[in-house]
Amino acid sequence: MKLSRRDFMKANAAVAAAAAAGLTIPTVAKAVVGETTNAIKWDKAPCRFCGTGCGVLVGTQNGRIVASQGDPDSPVNRGLNCVKGYFLPKIMYGKDRLTQPLLRMKDGQYDKEGDFTPISWEKAFDIMELKFKNALKEKGPTAVGMFGSGQWTVWEGYAASKLLKAGFRSNNLDPNARHCMASSVVGFMRTFGMDEPMGCYDDIEEADAFVLWGSNMAEMHPILWSRMTSRRLTNEHVRIAVLSTFEHRSFELADNPIVFTPQTDLVIMNYIANYIIQNNAVDQGFLDRHVNFRRGATDIGYGLRPTHPLEKAAKNPGSDASEPMSFDDFKAFVAEYTLEKTAKMSGVPEDQLESLAQLYADPKVKLVSYWTMGFNQHTRGVWANNMCYNLHLLTGKISKPGSGPFSLTGQPSACGTAREVGTFSHRLPADMVVTNEKHRQIAETKWQLPAGTIPEKVGLHAVAQDRALKDGTLNAYWVMCNNNMQAGPNINEERMPGWRDPRNFIVVSDPYPTISALAADLILPTAMWVEKEGAYGNAERRTQFWRQQVPAPGEAKSDLWQMVEFAKRFKVEEVWPDELINKKPEYRGKTLYDVLFANNVVNKYPLSEIPADQLNDEARDFGFYIQKGLFEEYADFGRGHGHDLAPFDRYHQERGLRWPVVNGKETLWRYREGFDPFVPKGEDVRFYGKPDGKAVIFALPYEPAAESPDQEYDLWLSTGRVLEHWHTGSMTRRVPELHRAFPEAVLFIHPLDAKARGLRRGDKVKVISRRGEVISLVETRGRNRPPQGLVYMPFFDAAQLVNNLTLDATDPLSKETDFKKCAVKLARVVA
């Protein structure tokens, strides 16, 4: 049975009526399409795009997705979707969808300069096996690596961590979340000893004020923005402040719209801390019971190569050191950040700064701070996170309904996979780290490994992987579920040279021929979204499951299948030294698949637990319920330690649960008695990630950006996204409606800056940095309105690689790239 446009419109109308009446959508759909044998089947899934974690109902028929709706039973989005979410089915069916492995070949053999040629999976794994084994044999575990994703499912990330850190004994595993959430991770760990926000989306309906720091929620998290808009417009007392280096759509609702000079958010936060103290708005009792003060190391560099002049000049490059200080010391430290000084440095009028500070200082105002990439993609991103926590800790506005700091995520499982599973080069599951001997022992015990298997040295982070490929020390490299050739910084100087170096072999697993795929040596076709069973963890600690709903096209396979199947190619003797194998002689002759995935834990759940009519290609390929086995083994890391997850089967019944889940009950606000089961009675608040239960307020100064405009390169460049496209556009640009809505990137520029350079709206313009150049189109109107001296350009357009321009400077503590600040100049392109 086909669903006509008329029927689809009827279904939409019925869905709206059903939502109002409290009926479920599958019931309504049945009424619309009838009880025929090929009627549309509906099932739940979280959205494939940002970290909000909206619920979607997916309609399938005859092995294809034919419809989708916002899930009215989802507490996140309550039946709404953003414009990208409404077109989710179409991301699956681009005309250039990859359906078989492709290898660069010439005259029937692999050739680095050859043409992409279809091959079998067996031959694809043959060449991968050869290249990975050669790298391991010649240079050891540090010669292999993987760049993963905040779009991996929970068990894909967990399998990757086991394969790399245990199997290949290489910590050279990092996710693309390094580019977006690493500063938040380090900030949370530094202040609270545990990662991820303590609050939840319920704060939106409870708060009296919202402050957005470097977050354009209207376009990047539109469903949360709709909830905030409702809160603001239906409650006259509610206020919204928006801070950014340029005006954007979120400014349209702002009561206090603030445009500041890049990097001076650090100054503004220290001013607010000073204001709170000077106006006796400190919650002294809260500080005395729950907070310590520390002074952080300064002049820590910019995460550039050690030979860079800025790194040579830094006194404490990469230092995370700090020393105890008193409240009075902190008071003296922030005293220099006066209203007058802050206004002068930031360019923000004094009355706007004071109005902002009053929101934080007023004890009657419940306030939530939200931030995204403006804070995190920052050479002092960790400091920015710490300084925001300072404001909430000084006032006690934390860990309670309507008040708290909240880092919003940009990918669907940057939290659930990259952070919680621990696919960063320094992390293990449940906030454990490879540098901690006890943590390594815990992982080795749970994974049934010989003691000493997991290396203690931190592996290569995202930017360091690029540098190692260029330097020829990282030689076998697997990129999954991301498009880093387009998304990462400084493409020309630091990434492309390593990828095309004949010493290196690059594998890219992707559903589409992205810039990254086309720069690789081997492309593996990948199943996406509901073509596999999956789990994501969103920004409010909500873990959500979905079942496979359609088969993948052609020979496309999930990332999980690819990694687990590839593990069969390696015997332990080929990857582990004798001293390790001698500790577990029973592993001799076994493959990494046997040791890591057929270990009587991962493979203990039989296929009979999967309904006979339910798709699950991976499980049936391996002969056991692999997703359940991986999840339960992983979940054991956090249970009883404040990272508790519910049993696997519960998630298939729920619209997600926010961890820690204890005795079947989710946790909405962490660290607060009465909400968090890990806070002992009588303590009120306990930040139990720290041994003494106290959070840390850090004294940290303003330090300048790594690169600022000068006489030649006279403009700031900031990069980012637009509503219609997600990241590099590899999915959304294949949706005709989204592509037509915003077909190509433009350079947003102030009209006076354009006029001064002889440029008009629609002109072609060459944007030039010290690292490269790109041609774009001048846009002096529209949704983004930069101040004079700054231009803004989105990075979704593969024909305009804005990251040819960006600098690979990172936060020295989080290793996250600053995509928001570099210097450029413009030149008019004469037709």
UniProtKB/Swiss-Prot annotation:
Annotated ranges, domain 4Fe-4S Mo/W bis-MGD-type: 40-96
Any one GO CC term of the record: membrane
Binding site for [4Fe-4S] cluster: C47, C50, C54, C82
SMART domains: Molybdop_Fe4S4
GO MF terms held by the record: 4 iron, 4 sulfur cluster binding; electron transfer activity; iron ion binding; molybdenum ion binding; molybdopterin cofactor binding; nitrate reductase (cytochrome) activity
Disulfide topology: none
Listed EC numbers: 1.9.6.1
Cofactor(s) annotated in UniProt: [4Fe-4S] cluster; Mo-bis(molybdopterin guanine dinucleotide)
Annotated residues for binding of Mo-bis(molybdopterin guanine dinucleotide): 84, 151, 176, 180, 213-220, 244-248, 263-265, 373, 377, 483, 509-510, 532, 559, 719-728, 803, 820
Alphabetically ordered keywords of this record: 4Fe-4S, Electron transport, Iron, Iron-sulfur, Metal-binding, Molybdenum, Nitrate assimilation, Oxidoreductase, Periplasm, Signal, Transport
SUPFAM superfamilies named in the record: ADC-like (SSF50692), Formate dehydrogenase/DMSO reductase, domains 1-3 (SSF53706)
Entry's family note: Belongs to the prokaryotic molybdopterin-containing oxidoreductase family. NasA/NapA/NarB subfamily.
Descriptive protein name: Periplasmic nitrate reductase
